[in-house]
Amino acid sequence: LANTISYNELLKQVDEIGCPQLQRLTMEYLPITFGRRHGDPSRPWNQFEIKLLDDEKQKILSYQGNWRDIFQNWEALTFSYPEFIESVIAKFVNASTVDGYNPYRITKQGIDWEVEEPDDPWSYIGYWGDHQIIYLQKLLELSHQFHPNKLTELLRKDVFSYANVPYRIKSFADIKQNAKSTVTYDNALADKIDEVVASKGADGKLILDQSGQVYQVNLIEKLSVALLAKLGNLILGGGIWLNTQRPEWNDANNALVGQGVSVVTLCYMRRYVEFMLQLLSNEKGQVSVSSEVAQWLQGTRATLANAEGLIASDEVNDESRFQITNQLGELAWSYRDTVYQQTGFSAKEGVEVNEIIDLLHNAKVAIDYTIAQNQRQDGLYHAYNLLSLNDDRLEVDYLYPMLEGQVAALSSGALDAPTVNNALDVLFSSDVFRPDQHTFMLYPDRQLPSFLNKNKVPSELANSNELIAALLQQDNHTIVVKDANGDCRFNGKLTNADRLQEELAALPAELQMAVERDRGEIFKIYETVFNHKAFTGRSGGMFGFEGLGSIYWHMVSKLLLAVQECYFNATDNNADADDIQRLANHYYQVRQGIGFNKTPSEYGAFPVDPYSHTPKHSGAQQPGMTGQVKEEVLTRFGELGLRVRHGQIKVQPSLLRVREFNTDAKSFTYLNINNEWQNLELEPNSLAFTWCQVPIVYRLVETKPGLTLNTKSGQMTSDALLIDSEMAQSLFKRDGIIESIYVDIPRDQLSSIK
């Protein structure tokens, strides 16, 4: 190979060699230097290093960071470097596990996972819940838009791997017993992986076949396993059970682990399932997948078909909900147990594509039903619910509204334009809205009870319980005490229900009959007083970061992108013109609250710098390359109307305002594909930007629209604001053929918003 080669040419040459292992390694290669830290650097998943030189002081390409933040940034990066979209997808799925999750950290050299340290009380392992679906889905959509056929080519191509993370999710029976303690660390497997890594390098952290080679599967299998893992925790009418010891995007909801149910992930699954249905719509015959995956898929399909029947006959209740969840959970455990024992798969077998499509249809029915059940009476949507497992019943209770839930519902694709507009109207008038900043908190602010108002046993409950009365009479403070005001309180040492159980068992023998009689009632009183189930974690007890009264700017910008997506979906589907205009108005309402529109005194910081959050008691805090930057890179391209469909570029600037255009002549400086700084003189009533390092100039005109491509061989003009696939691919590949693009836009094609 030459010292420099086009990436597409490299992939082509590797394909011609016909070695699947080499194809895997080449596909996931990303020639970038990038270090990504997010949040508290003391957390192991946030460790990073920006390494530019090797030990011999030679330049190297290297990157590392936590999984979520790497991939959320790469979504925006690939919009400007689209030839690497499929490589990012490969990097993503090659590092996901056999049980459908992802390690917490990713580097050019491979993957990392947190190692359990029994002597460290802060050491904690597990899997975050939402990353596997929505971040992958956004990348899949980009591939489909920029390269319409590439995903189809990969569906049956065995060039993808599984990460071999030494975590073991417990049996479903164990999860039902204690959903907060569900993941164990397999020390023996971890030691074995270390031995293999010593001889094979980074590939030693992947699942291997019997010959010692990396076990490789196709894209259909990888996409299916990610979905099946979520469906294995489906609660009809509730969401996805958070039972892998970690929360989701908002890790300040850490106490929701175990009893929490995510509507957020369910909404993203809806988008994922709809996309997979489109992707497989033209596929016929059989596809080869691992035998254990085939069995899991077929069992899940049958169970979801039963669920569809319950939904159709309006028979979903606490008992039938339990039956469906139990069946799905046991199927997932049967699969996990088998692949854990084998440390991999036994063989491959053919599965009819129609079976997968049937599964997707069944799943969509269950998902749509559950989303509908989680629409509140005011038109907003629940984000997280609470689960109670009692014998053979699953009961679902609700929390307060959260901004995250509205973003997920809008992003799901399940809502039509009038429903979206109604939800946004309600959101702006809800307790989530902070008028002083014209934007949204993560959840409504609320007044927490003072310390002395906590842990009070209502007198009617204390007086009616014979055991409590006996303990107080005997002046036994093991379980309850009376304070100076006569209020009955639980002993401060009873930090959880397990400790309460221990202390009840340790009471004197003469009280044990009363303990047996009143045990259930005591636990009910304990939960009534503390309501542990509804405690969300740091989000319910702190006042900065993701705490009470706090604006988290990344989620605000996620809302902005979701509203923009709904706007373009409405235009694509020829929705009512008034609904489309209302969506545009809502978009700019959300946008108006973002920092760059504010003065330094309003924002509490320099307005064009990204900040993590704004607490109620101060200005913007914690500057840095937050996820907000990624979302607003994407929304800005959307405002400019750059829409990629079927490999073509459609310029549709209907969200762009006239005020964006220069009123005077200006000079525009940009860096071209040869890394040379260039100047472009702009006329009044124009604006300029670059995409794939090609300058694009918009000009306001009073006549008809037009588009001009200035190429090496001359000019190409068109009355349609469309760049065909041939020239679009030239732009995406940065091949230098297109030197500049000029777009003439009549005022009536721009937004009417001032």
What are these regions, as identified by a protein language model?
Residues 1-754:
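Acidic, mature catalytic/reactive cores of soluble proteins
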